[in-house]
Amino acid sequence: MAFNMKNRHLLSLVHHTEREIKYLLDLSRDLKRAKYAGTEQQKLKGKNIALIFEKTSTRTRCAFEVAAYDQGAQVTYIDPNSSQIGHKESMKDTARVLGRMYDGIEYRGFKQSIVQELADYAGVPVFNGLTDEFHPTQMLADVLTMIEHCDKPLSEISYVYIGDARNNMGNSLLLIGAKLGMDVRICAPKALLPEASLVEMCEKFAKESGARITVTEDIDKAVKGVDFVHTDVWVSMGEPLETWGERIKLLLPYQVTPELMKRTGNPKVKFMHCLPAFHNSETKVGRQIAEKYPELANGIEVTEEVFESPMNIAFEQAENRMHTIKAVMVASLA
């Protein structure tokens, strides 16, 4: 079968093969080395890329913008406050307009159906910068980071995602591990585990790739021997703070603490987080939570002690957003 990534969307990684994902990871490493060495060649000169952000962003916006500029492309940042999107114009109509002006479109927002609609009607490649269901660019960065910090073959790397596993991070880490033949474990209270339909789909991918999938409430079973511990915030963007009470009660045993990291039994275990992280009470939201729940003053989903330790590789993970996003755009648009 011919191998061609040109003009490809990146919507969830569901429709990407293992070979295609590994190609994007290899290209990411090549582009990262070239940037560090000062030998990067611009492959996107003359390209224009629209960046639609219905949800706020630091890493995703900066990664797309710097990656595009490095490669010679121009970007336009579009949010609901500066456009007609969602107010006077549907996403379908927006797609048909932007597709005539831009070579590619990034979307960060809410339902997966919205980014799918963009892809259906734009006529140009569409890249998912985050939806409620999936976060594919983050997944490429996460796997690249794990490869860089583990000398095992990809198929032997094990990781656990612990916390609220119904969100885009839990879904996406399950999906990419299944696609790449990794040892992936999802650990959460029963009420916060991924949907059964997603687990079933990923189990089918695992049979093809040789991946080992574990979905469990049992913390000790999930963390035993893992190379990496992933987590994410307990309340995602757009959810009201009122939901914190019941979520904290459910998730407190799943907080990433020094003790939990020790329970892995791996002295080389690393901590990963897509960021931003509530690891202390120095942010506005962190202070609000600490005032109501004093036991979380030293961190919510992860404690300050773990976050500020050498175990934490979240900032290298964040940098890799840029290199992997650059690879996605170069593969599709160059």
Curated annotation (Swiss-Prot):
Catalytic activity: carbamoyl phosphate + L-ornithine = L-citrulline + phosphate + H(+)
Protein family according to the UniProt entry: Belongs to the aspartate/ornithine carbamoyltransferase superfamily. OTCase family.
GO cellular component: cytoplasm
Family matches, as Pfam families: OTCace, OTCace_N
Function statement: Reversibly catalyzes the transfer of the carbamoyl group from carbamoyl phosphate (CP) to the N(epsilon) atom of ornithine (ORN) to produce L-citrulline.
Record localization: Cytoplasm
MF terms (GO), sorted A to Z: amino acid binding; ornithine carbamoyltransferase activity
This protein's pathway: Amino-acid degradation; L-arginine degradation via ADI pathway; carbamoyl phosphate from L-arginine: step 2/2
Record's keyword annotation contains Cytoplasm: yes
GO biological process, one term: arginine catabolic process to ornithine
Residues binding L-ornithine, per UniProt: 168, 232, 236-237
Presence of keyword Transferase: yes
Entry binding sites for carbamoyl phosphate: 57-60, 84, 108, 135-138, 274-275, 321
Gene3D superfamilies: Aspartate/ornithine carbamoyltransferase
Name the UniProt record assigns to this protein: Ornithine carbamoyltransferase
Stored InterPro entries: Asp/Orn_carbamoyltranf_P-bd, Asp/Orn_carbamoylTrfase, Asp/Orn_carbamoylTrfase_sf, Asp_carbamoyltransf_Asp/Orn-bd, Orn/put_carbamltrans, OTCase_ArgI
The EC number(s) this enzyme carries: 2.1.3.3
Keywords: Arginine metabolism, Cytoplasm, Transferase
Gene (UniProt): arcB
